[in-house]
Amino acid sequence: GAADFVSKPIEKDRLINSIQTLIGKSENLKICIIEDDENLRFTVKEILEKQGNIVTEASNGKEALIKLNKEENLPDIILLDLMMPIMNGFEFLSQIKDTKIKSIPILVLTGADLDDNDKSFLKNETEKVIHKTDDTVLSIAEEINNVIKRTG
């Protein structure tokens, strides 16, 4: 579950660097990025694809649900933002409860301040919550790597 919540300032490029650090160790994964920040989504996708991974993307939870429900081969991992228009990350997680998508490990990437209810919900519904404000870049890479090791 998503037991650890850390929040210290970090820039997007450090988050991206941490993802790049980890994905260097992993290739041939199918990864779905659900993120409304187009620049961040594009950059992370580019990094993941350069490492030999197959990346699908969606700009909100509704778009992701439509795409994932059409997929025959589901992704190995989902990177999910929480604060998005149309359908946010919490709504996405609620919508997938009784679907095949529920079995996919989900890493939440968020800059949001979470209250105890949010933390409790995410702990039960996701592998890990990684704050976009997380100061420990290495821990971000390690968490993604840990999920990959456990699942594949």
What are the language-model segments listed below?
Residues 35:
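Conserved acidic carboxylate
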Residues 81, 110:
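Active-site residues of response regulator receiver
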Residues 42-50:
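Charged docking surfaces used in two-component/phosphorelay signaling
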Residues 3, 127:
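Short, glycine/charged-rich "phosphate-handling" switch motifs in NTP-dependent
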Residues 10-19, 47, 118-121, 133-148, ...:
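C-terminal output helix
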